[in-house]
Amino acid sequence: MAYPFELGFQDATSPIMEELLHFHDHTLMIVFLISSLVLYIISLMLTTKLTHTSTMDAQEVETIWTILPAIILILIALPSLRILYMMDEINDPSLTVKTMGHQWYWSYEYTDYEDLNFDSYMIPTSDLSPGELRLLEVDNRVVLPMELPIRMLISSEDVLHSWAVPSLGLKTDAIPGRLNQATLTSTRPGLYYGQCSEICGSNHSFMPIVLELVPLKHFENWSSSML
């Protein structure tokens, strides 16, 4: 989860988020090199006393500043497209969970089970126990098995919402009348927090998401107790 004054991303807990962090570093390195080159050229232009008033064209320079940006864009686009297709790829999910956005709470349905569904509301600040997080705790957590591919079906009952869990690299719009899907796989157990990331009304800030990733055996015990 995020911490006060944190400058970086949250710790990655899924293969997709790890790829996104690598892509971020790759792109930031390219941006840093371009910025350094531009600043260096500007400093040379401001400090040099040489002028070239008779120069009308420079085909070699024009060729370089046409080809070089194209190469840079390709170096950014190729890994970006690779991650984009990885995020859309869903191969034989072990579990499917349907998520519906409401004003202002989430409801979840485990479609592989006959009658396993519940609503998830934020716990008011006045009801929090010591050690619990303000505006992030819910009365019903989404319990999921770790190290297994899980498909999330996401939609909305009323207005636009967005189901987002940063540490898993997930952010999918919940649109009324449309069913979007995303896949997640967690590499380690734990609690992972998210929030609605689309302004949806006066209580938009009070729609937290809490995923509890547990080993498969613990998930089976939990699902049996819920039925």
Swiss-Prot record:
Cu cation A1 binds at H161, C196, C200, M207. The keyword Membrane applies. It catalyses: 4 Fe(II)-[cytochrome c] + O2 + 8 H(+)(in) = 4 Fe(III)-[cytochrome c] + 2 H2O + 4 H(+)(out). It is a multi-pass membrane protein. Keywords: Copper, Electron transport, Magnesium, Membrane, Metal-binding, Mitochondrion, Mitochondrion inner membrane, Respiratory chain, Translocase, Transmembrane, Transmembrane helix, Transport. Mg(2+) binds at E198. InterPro entries: CcO_II (IPR045187), CcO_II-like_C (IPR002429), CcO_II_C (IPR034210), Copper_CuA (IPR001505), Cupredoxin (IPR008972), Cyt_c_oxidase_su2 (IPR014222), Cyt_c_oxidase_su2_TM_dom (IPR011759), Cyt_c_oxidase_su2_TM_sf (IPR036257). Its EC number is 7.1.1.9. Its main location: mitochondrion. It comes from Neotamias cinereicollis. It is an enzyme of class 7 (translocase). Residues 1-14, 88-227 are mitochondrial intermembrane. Its cofactor is Cu cation. Component of the cytochrome c oxidase (complex IV, CIV), a multisubunit enzyme composed of 14 subunits. The complex is composed of a catalytic core of 3 subunits MT-CO1, MT-CO2 and MT-CO3, encoded in the mitochondrial DNA, and 11 supernumerary subunits COX4I, COX5A, COX5B, COX6A, COX6B, COX6C, COX7A, COX7B, COX7C, COX8 and NDUFA4, which are encoded in the nuclear genome. Residues 46-59 are mitochondrial matrix. Gene3D superfamilies: 1.10.287.90, Cupredoxins - blue copper proteins. Component of the cytochrome c oxidase, the last enzyme in the mitochondrial electron transport chain which drives oxidative phosphorylation. The respiratory chain contains 3 multisubunit complexes succinate dehydrogenase (complex II, CII), ubiquinol-cytochrome c oxidoreductase (cytochrome b-c1 complex, complex III, CIII) and cytochrome c oxidase (complex IV, CIV), that cooperate to transfer electrons derived from NADH and succinate to molecular oxygen, creating an electrochemical gradient over the inner membrane that drives transmembrane transport and the ATP synthase. This is Cytochrome c oxidase subunit 2. Pfam families: COX2 (PF00116), COX2_TM (PF02790). GO terms for molecular function: copper ion binding; cytochrome-c oxidase activity.
